[in-house]
Amino acid sequence: MEIKRFLHGGEETYRCLALDVSPRLAVLLFPHPGERRAGGFLFPAGSRTYGFFWARRHYLLYVLHGPDGGLIAHRFDVVDEVRLGPGRVEYLDLALDVWVDPSGRAWTEDEDEVVELFSQGLLSPQRLSLIERTQRLLLARHRRIAAEAGDELRRLGQMHGNVG
């Protein structure tokens, strides 16, 4: 189970399958039985998302694949307070997302939400600085992080070939 907590106090829970959970990293699988859209991408029915949640990193990664196994996109979420445990992954969402298309083009989403959270006093100056540092890191190193995720999926026997 993925538990996504928000700075305003709410939370969302997502059902998933744990492929591997260690004190360092949890890898989860989210099947998508129905079609959906996000980040300007279409995810056909039968698509799947692999989630990578690191205990000591301020981001998580979703690797999104179509029903044919082809890469649709990568999405990184800036997060804090990641907790990995048996049957659950929990974290605090810090609003900013970085999307990367299969060509490697990267862009950020929800910067306006970050500004609004800061102006409402829900985001401390320290966390704002953390978001900015993590954004720079993700824009500079998304290819390396995606390759690391691909290696992990191959180790788990979930993929053959390139993860993107």
PLM-predicted stretches and their roles:
Residues 76-79, 83, 90, 130-146:
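A long amphipathic alpha-helix within ATP-dependent nucleotide-binding catalytic cores
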Residues 1-48:
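Charge-rich, low-complexity N-terminal segments
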Residues 42-83, 89-96:
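Phosphate/ribose-recognition catalytic cores of enzymes acting on nucleotide-derived substrates
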Residues 21-23, 67-68, 101-103:
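Short acidic-glycine loop/turn motifs at beta-strand connectors
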Residues 25-26, 71, 106:
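Hydrophobic residues embedded in beta-strands of well-ordered beta-sheets
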Residues 94-139:
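A hydrophobic, small-residue-rich beta->alpha segment in the mid-to-C-terminal subdomain
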Residues 37-42, 86-87, 117-121:
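A short, polar/proline- and glycine-enriched secondary-structure boundary/capping micro-motif
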Residues 134-164:
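Cysteine/selenocysteine-centered motifs that mediate thiol-based redox chemistry or coordinate metal-sulfur cofactors
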